[in-house]
Structures are given as C-alpha cells and as structure tokens.
Amino acid sequence: VGSRGSLEQLNRYLEDLGVGLYPSVDFLQVHRNGLADLYLEFLHAPRGLDRSAAYVNTFHIATYQPIDGRQTALLSPARLAEVIDSFLRGYNRYGISGLALGDLGLLLYADYRLNPNRLVDRVMAAEIIAQEVERLAQEKRLMIAGGNAYVLPYAEVLVEAPLFARGTAIVHQTVPFYPLVVSGLVEYAGQPFNLSDHRGEFYLLKLLETGAVPYFALSWDPSFETKNTDFDYLFSTYYPEIKRDVLAVYNQVRAVLGGSWPAVMVDHKVLAPNVCETTYASGLRVVVNYTSQPYQLSEDLVVPAVGYVVLQGGN
C-alpha cells in the first residue's frame, strides 16, 4: 500500500465502512534476512534429527519440484516470544486492531538441539505457539490461516481451513468433521476460490455443504506481474477478470445460506457415495450431489448432477 501514511489511511477508510483490516505476518518463516534483521542460522534456526538447519522448500508451480536456491529459513519455536515482542512494539504504532497470522496456525515442528535444556519437541512447540497466540489475541483481533486445534480458541476468523480431503486413493468417502466443530462458532473459509484445486461448482457445493464463507485472493494489478517472483502462486488474482465469478459465488451462497447465518451445522448425512445432506440450526437442509449423475431424492425430487437442492424443514 506504499507508505505508513497510506496504510493508516486504508485502515481508517475500512473502519468507516465497518470492514476489518488484517495485515498478514509470518512469524515462523524468515522471508527476508538483512543485516538489520539479525537472524543467524546457527542461533535461530530449528535443527533436524541430523542437527542440520531446517527450512521450507519452494516448489515449482507446474512440476511441483523444489526450486534450487528458493528455500525459506525457519525460526526455532524457542525464539518466538522475543520476535513477537519486537513485532508488537512496532505494529502497535499503526493503530490497527486486526492481525492475520499466516503460519502460526499452519506450521508445527521441533528443534532437536544437542543441549537437552534447549531442545523443543512438537508438544512443547504447540504449547509455545498457543501461548504466544493467546498473548496476541489479548491485543488484536486475529485471523488465523490453517487453524490447528491449539489456536482455535483465539481466532475471530479462520481461512485455509480444511474443507476437502487430501484425495488419498483408498478413501472413498469423507466426513466434514472440522466444519462440524467450528461452524457457528467462528467465521471460517477454505482455500481461496480462485487458487483452489477445487473450483467452479465443486467449490460452491462444498460451501453449501459446510457453511463456510466464500474466500478469494484478489489483486488490482494483473497477475502476470507476479511471474518469476516469490508470489507466482498468485496466478489468477486479477479482480477485473474474475469479478463475475466472485459475484456469482457470493450471491448464490447468500441466496441459500444468507437467512441461516451463522450457519451452524447440526447434522450431516451421507445419502449415497458423494451425495450428502446437511441440516443447519435454522432448520434449513441442503442436499449436494458431487457426482456426474442425477440423484433421486424422493419420488418427485431429483438432485441434479453436480448440483444441489434446498429444503426448509420437511419441504
């Protein structure tokens, strides 16, 4: 957004509209390491079982092979508190009430130091992260990506929550357990519609089945500006080109679930393979059909292929 003044102006503009601003920050991934950042691998990086420094690979978007020289360094959970202390001292000067946590709800790893007093296992790491997220939640309204269980109590909004199964070949049916737990308690969304592997009607059906909100990653500049950069995964975000899709998805979800929001799931049934019925607390029932064949729900009611029907009560 440019300068500090531009960010503060954007925050005031959104506040006047009643829209929350959640600038995103990664605390566990070190995307930049200049002289002023003071990140030293031998002091601050987590260690694997072989004592080498751990990192996250960046994968080629077409081949999904790791890209040489594009590894992202990681921060040891033991160092998290001091980094957050430093961040808050600077961030609080902007007067922004929201904050988006990009990786604290997604990543969990150990730090296998030789010194047992400095070793951090995964259980300890989860406890450290939960403690720091709780501290952030006392000062800011939090949007959390991923939503691991130990950060759920502190989230106002969840994004990139798991709505779809991973597609394992031996799995023939899934149950939306995560949405059943969080629906009605916190506003949540899955992957952005325009960046998800599941697009179009399948994405829409999943929103109607789970009560999740539509979620998009949008930019005002053309997507080709991100080519050959660290942001090349934002390959379909140009708002003028996908505006029609954005409005279509929002309007359709609002037409079905708008009167039931927040959409609290109270029952979920698998009527047939890839045909599911969800009942919401309002009495609204939605039957979704992910298959390529119509599903005969009753003598006079058919759920179209890759479609849905909406029932209110017994009607």
Predicted regions: what is each one?
Residues F27-N315:
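Active-site-proximal substrate-binding groove within the catalytic cores of carbohydrate-active enzymes
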Residues V1-L21:
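Aromatic-lined substrate-binding rim segments of carbohydrate-active enzymes
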Residues L14, G20, D26, Q312-G313:
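Long, low-complexity, polar and repeat-rich extracellular regions
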